């Protein structure tokens, strides 16, 4: 299977050089980027007036939570979770979760996301949807034991069951990740066991860390230290760890994260909507910490649009620092692409020969994207997910000219309405 993308503005290489060129894909790899490629291909896409971008990597989300979009807004995190989200989640079944996963996959494909790091329940169902959709998914079961040894064993067993299920799919696109929810919902015993199992099985770990001041206070009262210091003291960190949020980090925390090569997944929309705080982006970057970008779940965003998320990230840190030079467009674009891919150990996030063919084509033939003075600026500050015309993952076209090839959009939307009616 080969694809030839012609006449586009290509965001090329590590330096994000924008060139007018063609892109040739064979199997699941980019094999050539050059002007006027004169070779036959199974599929030819005319990208005139369009931008050929690396697909976006959503480094933290809860994809089935689109079911809860708009059900509870304008609340602090713990009120939102305890009074609204957790009671609804207690009613979830595998079928309901699968419907939510379809809705999330549909939204991601239509907005140019090609890879996502997920944490939720019934992750075997999410894995089935990911496989069918054509997306690249890194899937974690959210482990919570609340200090109960019986729950610790149960959560570990469920995670291992999901791992075995995902490995049984034998897909290069669908991967298992260990996902202890957070230091305030997981015992030290569970966190240590996750670290041991990740070493044994060679898996990544993702965990919520230092999202709110309430969490900082709770962990400080319980252990006498910050969540980051706590995790460091038990030997939890490594280059295979991706922490979500990292809002409330002091200088010592940042030094620890940098020393261990931990990645932080920044979720600006969710952090602003829940008034959790502003993560110290510039200090993290200055320390050499890899920072990716995530949307969090749709219930606290309220979408999975990575183009939208880039703009919010850029604007948030400029106004917070009273400095228009921070979080510049190129920095934020890297966070949404290559930085996320790097965290996952994925040779993607860059359009270059030898890299995986995970690509989004964005239609710039629109008034809000003309004139084309600066492609990266337009992608960060002007574009949105509805401007994505074509999405390619692993060398397979999932959407072309806004037409979907792997999912039934009408059925997914109808099922979502039915399920939320039954849940509420």
UniProtKB/Swiss-Prot annotation:
Say which domain of life the source belongs to: Archaea
Cofactors needed by this protein, per the record, are:
Zn(2+)
Per the UniProt entry, the Enzyme Commission number(s) are 3.5.4.28, 3.5.4.31
The family database entries (SUPFAM superfamilies) matched by this protein are listed as: Composite domain of metallo-dependent hydrolases, Metallo-dependent hydrolases
Task: Enumerate the catalysed reactions.
Answer: S-adenosyl-L-homocysteine + H2O + H(+) = S-inosyl-L-homocysteine + NH4(+); S-methyl-5'-thioadenosine + H2O + H(+) = S-methyl-5'-thioinosine + NH4(+)
The entry's keywords: Hydrolase, Metal-binding, Zinc
Residue numbers binding Zn(2+):
60, 62, 208, 296
A Pfam family annotated for this chain is Amidohydro_1
Presence of keyword Cell membrane: no
Specify which residues bind substrate according to the UniProt entry for this protein.
Answer: 89, 181, 211, 296
Give the main EC class.
hydrolase
Give the record's cofactor note, including how many are bound. Answer: Binds 1 zinc ion per subunit.
Record carries keyword Metal-binding: yes
Name one molecular function that GO assigns to this entry: metal ion binding
Q: Which family does it belong to?
A: Belongs to the metallo-dependent hydrolases superfamily. MTA/SAH deaminase family.
Tell me the function of this protein.
Catalyzes the deamination of 5-methylthioadenosine and S-adenosyl-L-homocysteine into 5-methylthioinosine and S-inosyl-L-homocysteine, respectively. Is also able to deaminate adenosine.
NCBIfam families membership: PRK08393.1
Tell me the protein's name. Answer: 5-methylthioadenosine/S-adenosylhomocysteine deaminase
**Species per Swiss-Prot/TrEMBL record:** Thermococcus onnurineus (strain NA1)
Which gene is the coding source of this polypeptide chain?
mtaD
């Amino acid at each position: 299977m080969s694809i030839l993308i012609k006449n586009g503005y290509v965001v090329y290489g590590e330096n994000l050089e924008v060139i007018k060129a063609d892109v040739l894909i064979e199997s699941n790899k980019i094999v050539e980027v050059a002007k006027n490629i004169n070779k036959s291909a199974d599929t030819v896409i005319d990208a005139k007036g369009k931008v050929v971008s690396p697909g976006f990597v959503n480094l933290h989300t809860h994809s089935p939570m689109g079911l809860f979009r708009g059900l509870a807004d304008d609340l602090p995190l713990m009120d939102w979770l305890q009074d609204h989200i957790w009671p609804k989640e207690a009613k979830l079944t595998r079928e309901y979760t699968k419907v939510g996963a379809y809705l999330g996959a549909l939204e991601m494909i239509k907005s140019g996301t090609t890879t996502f790091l997920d944490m939720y329940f019934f992750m075997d169902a999410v894995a089935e949807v990911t496989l069918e959709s054509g997306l690249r998914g890194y899937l974690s079961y959210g482990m919570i034991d609340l200090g109960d040894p019986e729950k610790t064993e149960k959560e570990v067993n469920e995670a291992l069951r999901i791992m075995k299920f995902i490995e049984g799919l034998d897909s290069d696109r669908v991967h298992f990740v260990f996902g202890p929810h957070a230091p305030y919902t997981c015992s030290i015993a569970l966190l240590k066991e996750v670290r041991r199992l990740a070493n044994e099985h060679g898996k990544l770990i993702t965990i919520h860390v230092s999202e709110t001041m309430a969490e900082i206070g709770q962990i400080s009262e319980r252990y006498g230290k910050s969540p980051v210091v706590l995790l460091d003291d038990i030997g939890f960190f490594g280059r295979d760890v991706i922490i979500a949020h990292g809002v409330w980090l002091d200088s010592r925390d940042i030094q620890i994260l940098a020393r261990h090569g931990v990645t932080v997944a920044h979720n600006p929309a969710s952090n602003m909507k829940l008034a959790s705080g502003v993560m110290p982006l510039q200090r993290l970057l200055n320390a050499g910490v890899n920072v990716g970008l995530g949307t969090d779940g749709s219930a606290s965003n309220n979408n999975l649009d990575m183009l939208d998320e880039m703009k919010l990230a850029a604007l948030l840190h400029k106004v917070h620092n009273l400095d228009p030079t921070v979080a510049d467009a190129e920095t934020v674009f890297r966070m949404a692409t290559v930085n996320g891919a790097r965290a996952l150990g994925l040779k993607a996030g860059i359009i270059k020969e030898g890299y995986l063919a995970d690509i989004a084509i964005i239609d710039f033939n629109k008034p809000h994207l003309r004139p084309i003075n600066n492609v990266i600026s337009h992608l960060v500050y002007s574009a949105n997910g509805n401007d994505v015309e074509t999405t390619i993952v692993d060398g397979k076209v999932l959407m072309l000219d806004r037409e979907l090839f792997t999912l039934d959009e009408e059925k997914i939307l109808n099922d979502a309405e039915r399920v939320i009616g039954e849940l509420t």
